[in-house]
Curated annotation (Swiss-Prot):
Annotated InterPro entries: BMP2_TGF_beta-like, Cystine-knot_cytokine, TGF-b_C, TGF-b_propeptide, TGF-beta-rel, TGFb_CS
Pfam families listed in its UniProt record: TGF_beta (PF00019), TGFb_propeptide (PF00688)
GO process terms (BP): BMP signaling pathway; cardiac epithelial to mesenchymal transition; cardiocyte differentiation; cartilage development; epithelial to mesenchymal transition; heart development; heart induction; lung vasculature development
Gene: BMP2
Superkingdom field: Eukaryota
Protein name: Bone morphogenetic protein 2
Major location category of this protein: secreted
Region of interest called Disordered, as start-end residue ranges on this chain: 270-292
Propeptide boundaries: 24-281
Length: 395
């Protein structure tokens, strides 16, 4: 029953995508596909469309169709992560730390901090900021397996050609108890630390898994992080602003969006397999004579721009879903990938037409990775199971 339901969903999903769903697929997308099909099709009732909409949104883990603003920003980190796990040519080199984190997760989420909550008292030789990330959009059923805080540090002109000096130490703390009237500094717990030499520009990644797990799985209050930059060499004229833990006075929005701090969570909702690097599958060539009408896989490309979903689905722009269609004639040939039950059912059908023939259905399905903006304009990379037909057979 479960396999049959999955096969049905695999077949119905492209039909819903291409046929339209009220509210989920805009009217423009439905008209566009109807015009390209060249023939009129009966319109499903509003009740059926609403039911399909609910099912599709549930599959994506969404409560409503995302409608992101034009100012929504997709962090380059998330784009690179998508390219890695979708096996795209020109993707960044493999990162063993990222591969390890993704191997236990099927969902990656990114969060920007709330800038209005940054300020902390300055101390001599240190730069400190509070980072608060609102994580309430993480579903309760999603178990966080790892989390990292990404901070960008810029190359200092004073450090060029000097490998011996200009070191900073970056400390990341979890806020256990916020500052009070009696104490201007919050109570903290050290999570990660790193000594850096600022002779190059690069992102630094810090492990904040223990804190995020306490906030999401154990119900502890989320008071945010403290990022502390300790200036180890006090030299005349040396800038202390090389670590981008706060916005400059007059930056343009695009530049700031590319280097602002980012919290990335890796989680698993218990559905399907973890993220993996998708390898291109080799077609199985079998030298057998097949009837043109026999059960086999047919091309079906779902283009998200055609149905008006490209405003919230970042990547891929579409995908090859394929579908199964064809006859399951008696006697069933070996290449039709039939079960014993299908063989018996086809045999009985040959002598009793009241018993239906075996059906041409997907026998093997695979997942795709999708990068999209959710209802809260948070960027999500998620692995969706049973989205691509890999093989067909008579069942």
């Amino acid at each position: 029953m479960v396999a049959g339901t999955r096969c049905l969903l695999a077949l119905l999903l492209p039909q819903v995508l291409l046929g339209g769903a009220a509210g989920l697929i805009p009217e423009l997308g439905r008209r566009k596909f109807a015009a390209s099909s060249g023939r009129p099709s009966p319109q499903p009732s509003d009740d059926i469309l609403s039911e399909f909409e609910l099912r599709l949104l549930s599959m994506f883990g969404l409560k409503q169709r995302p409608t992101p603003s034009r100012d929504a920003v997709v962090p380059p980190y998330m784009l690179d992560l998508y390219r890695r796990h979708s096996g795209q040519p020109g993707a960044p080199a493999p990162d063993h730390r990222l591969e390890r984190a993704a191997s236990r997760a099927n969902t990656v989420r990114s969060f920007h901090h709330e800038e209005s909550l940054e300020e902390l008292p300055e101390t001599s030789g240190k730069t400190t900021r509070r980072f608060f990330f609102n994580l309430t959009s993480i579903p309760p059923e999603e178990f966080i397996t790892s989390a990292e805080l990404q901070v960008f540090r810029e190359q200092m002109q004073e450090a060029l050609g000097d490998d011996s000096g200009f070191h900073h130490r970056i400390n990341i703390y979890e806020i256990i108890k916020p500052a009070t009237a009696n104490s201007k500094f919050p109570a903290t717990r050290l999570l990660d630390t790193r000594l850096v030499n600022q002779n190059t520009s690069r992102w630094e990644s810090f492990d904040v898994t223990p804190a995020v797990m306490r906030w999401t799985a154990q119900g502890h209050a989320n008071h945010g992080f403290v990022v502390e930059v300790t200036h180890l060499e006090e030299k005349q004229g040396v800038s202390k602003r090389h670590v981008r833990i706060s916005r400059s006075l007059h930056p343009d929005e695009h530049s700031w969006s590319q280097i602002r701090p980012l919290l990335v969570t890796f989680g698993h909702d218990g559905k399907g397999h973890p993220l993996h690097r998708r390898e291109k599958r080799q077609a199985k060539h079998k030298q057998r004579k097949r009837l043109k009408s026999s059960c086999k896989r047919h091309p079906l490309y779902v283009d998200f721009s055609d149905v008006g979903w490209n405003d919230w689905i970042v990547a891929p722009p579409g995908y090859h879903a394929f579908y199964c269609h064809g006859e399951c004639p008696f006697p069933l040939a070996d290449h039709l990938n039939s079960t014993n039950h299908a063989i018996v059912q086809t045999l009985v059908n040959s002598v009793n037409s009241k018993i239906p023939k075996a059906c041409c259905v997907p026998t093997e399905l695979s997942a795709i990775s999708m990068l999209y903006l959710d209802e809260n304009e948070k960027v999500v990379l998620k692995n969706y199971q049973d989205m691509v037909v890999e093989g067909c057979g008579c069942r």
